[in-house]
Amino acid sequence: MLFRSNVSKKFAPIAGKKKCIVIDNSSFFRMDKDVPLIVPEVNPHHVSDFKKKNIIANPNCSTIQMVTALSPLHKEFTIKKVFVSTYQAVSGAGKAAMDELFNQTKGVYVNDSSIPEQFTKKISFNVIPHIDVFMDDGSTKEEWKMS
């Protein structure tokens, strides 16, 4: 299923109860202890853990790339700590964010500055060192998902 979390939340359990095996790409089931989080190149042996709910989840895109690259190194050398920088596309924040990027970019050429609404700062021609919401421990949700 490639839907927003609310769609997966509603329909994946229905399909699972009807004995369909659901492979969900949304974020909804990623932290569910009864749903295996699978990266086939890293932990294919956990695929059979889907049987409680008939749902398999996958991590977010940054995590998949990171664990795929680090898995063979970890097996050989036992990695203890990793420092990661990710750069996320504006498109991941949705249509309103894309519209804001377009309008800000256009505004640079016609001397029309707009006030950011989707981001904390102007996004056109910029890199913002922040993604998602802040958690109680001061990290962002994106950092939490990768830890």
Where are these regions (language model features)?
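Oxyanion-binding "anion nests"
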Residues: 118-147
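N-terminal Rossmann-like NAD(P) cofactor-binding subdomain of oxidoreductases
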Residues: 1-123
